[in-house]
Amino acid sequence: MVILFRGPSRLHQASNPKPPGSSNERRRRGSTRSKLSIDEVRNVKLAAPPGARFKGYTSFVVQDLVIRRHVVNFRCERWQMPDGGTMTAALLDGIDGHFGPQLRRFVLAQYHQGQMTVPRLVTLLRSFGILICKRQVLRLLIERQDDFLTEARDTLRAGLSSAAWITVDDTGARHKATNGFCTQIGNAHFAWFGTTGSKSRLNFLELLRAGHDDYVINAEALAYMRQRALAAHVIARLVEHPERRFVGRKAWNAHLEALGIPALKVNPDPVMVATEGALWGSVRAHGFPDTVIVSDDAGQFNVGQHGLCWVHSERLVHKLDAFTAENRAAQATVRDLIWQFYADLKAYRCHPTKRRKTALRARFDRIFTRMTGFVTLDRLLMRLNANKPELLMVLDRPEIPLHTNGSENDIRCQVTRRKVSAGTRSDIGRDCRDAFLGLVKTCAKLEIAFWDYLGDRFVVPGCQAIPPLPKIILARARSP
């Protein structure tokens, strides 16, 4: 079977307003020299003819890169104590094993940010004169990375606790020769990835817990269960029990068994809905605010305040097959109306008013309740009209985006990694890949060079100090 890829909708690009005074001419780049710090100055001599007068210098700045092997033999002093014991001088900060901080920094940057494969990285290092093998490179990538894994987890917690909105997406991922899924969560300040074997709503709620392992029965959990139409007598059993917090899946399952919930024959599945509710209660209990989750309409992401991506919604109209001139004309008309409406939604985000909100709601109804005579298109418009609260979430929350382009851009690095290296074979390898790719994207969003970030974390001499990323995220979220 051949699958033809349809290009992305031009909805987003077509409705981007040009700034006042802008033109189609390319903007000239600024001076490169002003952005550079000079490391070395060389004077170039000239054999001047007799009678010439010296008139100073003409500067010509050249950027270069110095890559060379640097082997250090640390001779640590040893002293014998009066009691017969021996003391040895400690190595400098940043020295951990027989490969120095600069080499470890280079390996992580090339593999995660440069998307290199391990064999090619080994070949490159050997060409520099480094004596290293594939197994040693793998150890540099996955061993003793607890600090980075913790910072990636804390980045997610800081991002979720301070976010007015997040966008989410997922893609396929291979782990231990089994198909799985990688979920992206992020916004303008952070990005995080998590690879699991499922893409269910239960899985998404577990990811939103950001490493916490508890199940909580609180007001938010009960509201979720009622929204999902869980039987009232099942909710009553959970409410009547005095214990409301359970640490670990075993404790939660034991609690459900004690209440006799798994044995109930009701619809929807009481265990699944109760577990989802307890997970949602845990998410809210750990500081998840009234955040809007913007998605592409995948069912697993429909929790809490939920908004939909307009680009994905319009793409459904764009992808319809029209076989007659009348159908094509109807399709083009609807797409044009949606484009214009989308542009006005973007303008509303910049200057929201109550009057414009009312007008846009009425205009939405006119567009998505129209009958075109193109049956497939009419059914699609009815389907989109049913999503009115999610599509018009921006009217009540103007700060949220109208699309999930940010998530799609972020998750491309996972797709590239999958194509380059297929999949992971160990849990620590999977966790390190997800954590470092998330840190790479987060650094880019915070305008921090990943190379500088690694230099600070590996205590490379002369590197600038980089504060913990979660602190920067919280500070950015508080700033206007």
Residue ranges and their predicted role:
Residues 162-175, 295:
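Two-metal-ion RNase H-like nuclease active-site motif
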Residues 177-334:
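Catalytic nucleotidyl-transfer cores of nucleotide-processing enzymes
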Residues 93, 108-110, 122, 321-353:
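Conserved catalytic alpha/beta cores of large enzymes that bind or transform nucleotide phosphates
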Residues 1-98, 168, 214-274, 283:
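Short, flexible loop/hinge motifs at secondary-structure junctions
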Residues 1, 48, 81, 107, ...:
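Mobile genetic element proteins and their domesticated derivatives, centered on retroelements
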Residues 245-269, 288, 292-303, 332-480:
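Acidic/histidine-rich catalytic cores and adjacent linkers
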Residues 166, 275-280, 393-397:
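Flexible, glycine/threonine-enriched loop-and-boundary segments that flank and lead into catalytic domains
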Residues 66-164, 440-442:
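Short, positively charged, Gly/Tyr-enriched micro-motifs
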